[in-house]
């Protein structure tokens, strides 16, 4: 497989969007009471990131069966680079207090379609 930046250049050269975002998968460390206690601060932090355009999307994911909530989540950041995205993830109260651990990866968005902008926490819609 090619190096990441080489692949990104190849994608751009073939006309793909090649927009680099950062995907964080987050899992509880075991203390569910700490997760519940930290949730309000975590949600406030997410709203701040959304207002500052660093948060693209975030929310919980189910278990593999699709039937159970397992307190895992996915966060997509817009950041200058992996180090900047890691700063955002480290500052999340869930990670800062040790309620959750995370993995972060670069994501190259090449395809998809959006027709409008929605700020989920404030329920604002922009039909630009």
Task: Please annotate each region the language model reported.
Residues 1-128:
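Conserved, structured core segments of small domains
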């Amino acid at each position: 497989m090619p190096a990441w930046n080489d692949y990104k250049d190849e994608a751009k050269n073939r006309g793909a969007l090649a927009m680099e975002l950062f995907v964080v998968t987050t899992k509880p460390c075991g203390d569910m009471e700490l997760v519940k206690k930290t949730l309000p601060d975590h949600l406030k932090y997410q709203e701040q990131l959304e207002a500052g355009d660093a948060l693209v999307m975030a929310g919980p994911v189910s278990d593999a069966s699709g039937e159970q909530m397992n307190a895992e989540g996915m966060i997509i950041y817009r950041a200058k680079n992996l180090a900047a995205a890691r700063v955002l993830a480290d500052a999340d109260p869930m990670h800062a207090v040790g309620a959750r651990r995370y993995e972060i990866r670069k994501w190259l968005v090449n395809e998809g379609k959006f027709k409008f902008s929605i700020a989920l926490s404030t329920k604002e819609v922009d039909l630009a």
